[in-house]
Amino acid sequence: MPDAFIETAYFKDLTNRALLYLQAGYAVHFCGPAGTGKTALAMHVAELLGRPVVTLQGNDEYKPSDLVGGNSGMRRKKLLDNYVHSVWKAEESMDSIWYDGRITHACRNGHTFVYDDFTRSRPETNNVLLSVLQEKTLDLSAIQKGETRLTVHPDFSVLFTSNPSEYAGVHVLQDALKDRVITIAIKGLDRESEVAIVAGRSGLPWREAARIVDIIRGIRGNDIKKPSIRAAIMVATILATKGSKPSSSNPLFYQILMDVIGSEISYENDGENNSLLIKRIEMELDKYTPENRK
């Protein structure tokens, strides 16, 4: 199955804007609902920069040391001197062993840092990024003895992704960090982008992928969150695996839609779940036929 990034006109515009901001020395933040391609876009932009990429997934349990690094164990050094045959001289010392965290490694070596879902980490943890983005230095004084401040490599770049703050497990982005990044809002994908992605990821012909996308978009309605493009990719991939067609007369297609979309959509009244979903799927199957969409 093809894994290359599928760049439509919509994503091309986002890519060019992100590259411009990064080249000007600013951090870029892609923010939008789940399933809109934020992570894939961030990785695509990072690869275009031509530098090694360091990735990190946001986590509520992270501490600053999980980003910056810390001391791990001790190194013992013992020197025995027997230069004078009748005299032994011994010197012994112990030092802590420092390891670079991912942000430190990227800052030190000029790599591109992709911090995915970074608002899932606590604001106090992400505060270590403030000096990196503003003064281009990384403060290590609270963690490491000796080297207390690291100057950020001039080739260092950073890309963030996040879901809106109303998502479960997402912290509100602190103002100090918000002021240091350029946020590009990613909303619902246009139809052309969705069809291109579904066809590319699943291997289905464009016409068949378009029908699946139209059905998913119709069920989605005005809600840009569910079902997401991931549901369309799942349905298309399963059909491609089976060698089956997205036809209203195909009972397997109908059941796949029920299973995949039903796992994403939930209703307050579980007793109405199946009947409401069946009606919505049947309505979209009747509306989008191979003859009236290309």
Indicate residue ranges for each PLM-predicted region.
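AAA+ P-loop NTPase catalytic core and its hallmark functional loops
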Residues: 1-210, 294
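Alpha-helical lid/collar subdomain of P-loop NTPases
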Residues: 1-8, 24, 200-294
